[in-house]
Amino acid sequence: MVVGFGAWWTYFDFAGQRRPRPEPVSTVQWLLGHLPLTAAVAAMGAAMVSLVDHAHDGRTPAATAWVLSAGAAVVLGTTMVVAASLQAWQDKRGLYRPLARTSAVAAVACLGVGAARPTPLVLGLALVLLLSIPWGFAVARRLAGGADPPGTPQA
């Protein structure tokens, strides 16, 4: 369940409850970006049943590991695709550009964890940790004052 919270925090902290820029391309990007995002969240939820069923196994079943790990990677990637359609993407470049790179690295690491197929507990904990990296990065960046303040001129 904590993996689901990680996906939820990733989306709602960076893209959720925000409208796209008032441009046709941004609107289409925002709409279509939500399709793989919601599919990944649903798939992750379905795979959690198998993760719990195999909680005492020495390795996570391959299908379960891949669905959970790929789902987490898709959530990280598509959240940034959706975020790129927002006005904040342009207004807060100092936050969102490095955040997108951090999310991409975390997404690749999610796939690596899935390929390794550790025990179900380790898989779940690893995905929670990886989903928290972009959030932790953004919090640290904001606390350090490294994000572009509102109204920063565009380059």
Residue ranges and their predicted role:
Residues 150-155:
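Short, intrinsically disordered terminal tails adjacent to the first/last structured region
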Residues 1-112, 129-149:
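Predominantly late transmembrane helices and immediately cytosolic-facing juxtamembrane segments
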Residues 117-127:
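Loop-to-transmembrane alpha-helix initiation sites
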